[in-house]
Amino acid sequence: MLGLPELVTACLFDLDGVLTDTASVHRKAWAQAFDEFLDGRGEPTFTEQDYENYVDGKPRADGVRDFLASRGISLPEGDADDGADAQTVLGLGNRKNGLLLERIHSDGVAVYDGSRRYLEAARDAGLRRVVVSSSANTADVLHVTGLVPSPPHHRLRHHPAHQRR
């Protein structure tokens, strides 16, 4: 039924873009963060093309730097603990992440129906299942989507090489 060799005992599933549509939530959070930043600067608003060209799939700070550079704007780097209102690269990235978390919890995150069915079929077949992601917000997404195993016999670990999205 699953189309897997009989020797397979576990499956890894990527959270972002395979199980869930987090890209649309990221896109909205980036647009809000950048539009708030650009407001009053005489710059056009953040577009879908800007998302594709400058931030999609990049570590958060790289996305901020690349987008601002496309508009001829530079900010100091700042510190990882900069507040969301800090006029720094990392502050703007933190603002975006705060907006993302608000959207995750208020609007939810769409789960792809076919992926949910496959994940459930893997469970029913007795296969171990692991969800992987480079996102710092993995636990939040798993919680709001209901993809956390029940009962929760799992451990969430977050050790990305660098901060993403």
Residue spans of the language-model regions?
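N-terminal helical cap/lid subdomain that shapes the substrate entry/recognition surface
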Residues: P5-L15, L19-Y112
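Substrate-recognition "cap/lid" segment bordering the active-site pocket of phosphatases
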Residues: L127, V132, A136-R165
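A short, basic/flexible loop-to-alpha-helix module at the beginning of a structural domain
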Residues: M1-G3
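Catalytic-core regions built around general acid/base machinery
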Residues: G114-A125
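Generic leucine side-chain signal with a strong bias for well-ordered alpha-helical environments
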Residues: L12-L15, L19, L119, L142, ...
